[in-house]
Design a protein with these regions (language model features):
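Hydrophobic/aromatic beta-strand patches that form the interior of the parallel beta-sheet core
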Residues: 5, 14-17, 83, 109, ...
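Gly/Ser/Thr-rich beta-alpha loop segments that engage phosphate groups in nucleotides
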Residues: 47-50, 89, 190
Length: 212
């Protein structure tokens, strides 16, 4: 404690690293007993054991608050119909956005991933106004919609909440032209709940970090 006097002294503070999480797989770093854990998510584990995250009821409430703020910052309201085209499961993206959007009051369509023609049909038939997916899948959906003869003026899409992969400005422009919506970026990681860690607001001048 005596060493921490200036900002440069942060080097003396130990960090939790990926290796710590893997070495304590699956539950070794949980800070609460299992009777307090109400949900478990995990990363894909492509480079080793997956990162396992346990959530208490309070964690889920805080997480949905962060996601709701992220969505509100880009203009989502309780009048919106939000279609989630992330895969549901251990991946945090789908359920993270799902409960945040519900807390905001939006109507959520939990379509999950795949079956793109059906996805596009639901965009049209259900009057979806907010699309949640990876940017590359949004681009593909817009191409399928075009092939199906569905034009932008037949859809009600207005906002895209895209994440889980990088998105260049060129791809963003293509998505916006392809679907006629306002494209936004957000970021999350399993170690910090999931989506809701940071995201753009309607000004799109960088990601706002949720300090809480």
């Amino acid at each position: 404690g005596d060493k921490i006097k200036t900002l440069s002294d942060i080097q003396y503070i130990p960090y939790t690293e990926k290796s710590d999480i893997r070495d304590n797989y699956p539950y070794g770093l949980f800070a609460q007993p299992m009777k307090k854990i109400v949900r478990i998510h995990a990363s894909s584990g492509t480079t080793g054991n997956p990162t396992v995250v346990g959530y208490t009821r309070n964690d889920l409430d805080m997480w949905s608050d962060c996601v709701a703020r992220l969505c509100a910052a880009v203009g989502v309201t309780d009048d919106d119909v939000a279609q989630i085209s992330f895969g549901y499961g251990l991946f945090t993206g789908a359920l993270g956005l799902h409960y945040g959007l519900e807390k905001l009051g939006a109507a959520v369509i939990p379509v999950s991933s795949g079956n793109t023609e059906k996805q596009v049909k639901l965009l049209h038939d259900f009057g979806t106004t907010v699309l949640i997916s990876t940017p590359s899948y949004a681009m593909y959906m817009s191409e399928v919609a075009h092939d199906m003869g569905i034009s932008n003026d037949q859809l009600k899409l207005r906002i895209g909440l895209f994440g889980s992969e990088g998105c260049t400005n060129e791809l963003r422009d293509k998505i916006e032209k392809g679907f006629g919506l306002f494209s936004t970026d957000n970021y999350g990681m399993s170690e910090l709940c999931g989506p809701g860690v940071s995201g753009e607001c309607y000004l799109r001048e960088g990601l706002h970090f949720a300090e809480d």
